[in-house]
Every structure is written in structure tokens, then in C-alpha cells.
Amino acid sequence: MIKIDVFIKDKNWKKHISNPAKYLKDKVKFINSSTLFNKKYINFSILLAGNKEIKMLNNKFRKKNKTTNILSFPFYKRNEIKKKIKNEDRIYLGDIILNFYKIKKKARKNEFEKEFNKLWIHGLLHLLGYQHDTNKDFYKMRKLENRIFKQTEKTEC
């Protein structure tokens, strides 16, 4: 089972997705049947923010005084997460912060949800220890992102 906690800091999110919490909870349902979690109780949170909030967090935790599209804060170190998923029944993965304005800017007309889905999936994979530091890691992560994205696109929210 996957539990996702959604917090909305910027009101503009609801202009594009009327109920973001329900939307995300509906989207993650399919992951229960995947082999990523092997029937574990998984929890993570998403903060739907704007430029101001994400810039402040980026500066505070990464010492980068600029806005960004996404921040991921894994609860476990990269080399610990796979062991935790294998051995623990309940796991808190961490936090994802998404920037409405960066997503809106990158999304083409009527493709806000598509861009939003790509980004939260990307963040979730970071919480699971996936990185894109090398070409090999990049392609491995991208392949999994695309597979999950295709599954979420089939769901109706």
C-alpha cells in the first residue's frame, strides 16, 4: 500500500488540477501491483509549492539561491533504501517539492498534467535511490520513469 501526503502551498495548483491530493492518490494506485515495493507499506509526501517556497528550500538545503522545478529529500541514503525496502514492512521514503511555475512554463498548451506526472515520478525515483549521475544511471532511471509514466497515463482521475 502506498500512502501519499499532499500539501498545497501555492493556490495556482488548483487552477490546473482541481483536487491535487485525490489526483495523486489515484495515480499512485497502480504502483501497488508493481515489483518496486513488494507489497510493503510505503509513505512519502509531496509539497505543491511556488517559486518563493522552493527557492527558500533550495537555498536552505542545497545552498543554491535560485528556483528549481523539483526538490527531492530522501529519508534514507542511496545505499540504504534497497535494503530497507527488502527488510522493512513500513517505509517512509521522504519528501518531494514541486514548483508550479516551472512546470507551467515547461508544459505546452493543455499538457500541464503530463509534465506534472513526469516530474513527481522523477522525484519518487530519487526517493527510491535512483540517480542520473552517469549515462548508465540516467538511462536506467529514464527507462523506469517512462514505464511508470505510461501506466499513470492509462488511469483516469
Report each predicted region and the residues it spans.
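An acidic/histidine-cluster motif and surrounding catalytic segment
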Residues: 1-117, 127-157
